[in-house]
Amino acid sequence: MTNLELDLSVLFLITVILIWFMIAYQFVLTVFGYINYLKSFKEKRFVDENHFDFPTCSILIPAHNEEKVIGRTIESMLQLDYPKDKLKIIVINDGSVDSTKQIINQFVQNDDRVVLFDVPKGLGGKGKSRALNLALEIVESETIAIYDADNTPDKDALKYLAAQLILNKELGAVLGKFRTIN
């Protein structure tokens, strides 16, 4: 056997080992992913909606120059599967200079669950946390949800999060998965 043949044999052997290693790695990832998926169902507490008293909830959405996404976000919030009489959507306009405020006002006129909170002049433009703290003064609900202006939650996300918060008295806050528009 020449050196070239020996080198090719070693290279072939290394290649085969790497291929099998990658296959085994993918298999392990799949198994653990499936186990995690099954665990998530165990951890979820499904709620009998007919016998569960959902808390009132205010959704706070701070927005500063978000004209490209705010309409879709508010529409997404209005589509949430949550008792309509217990939901308030407070959109915080933090000194936007684009058409964000006009878009919000269209929703305010069409649905009484949507409320516009304009950050007072001189107090705006100082960050998301400042806008949220100012808007907290008008919240009257039992629970508060905070979404960014470019978030579109799943239809049942708020219902699930609120139920977890109420059912587990040790929790003070819950965080769900989210997806953004931009």
Q: Whereabouts are the PLM-identified features?
A:
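N-terminal membrane-anchoring/stem segments of glycan-assembly enzymes
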Residues: M1-H51
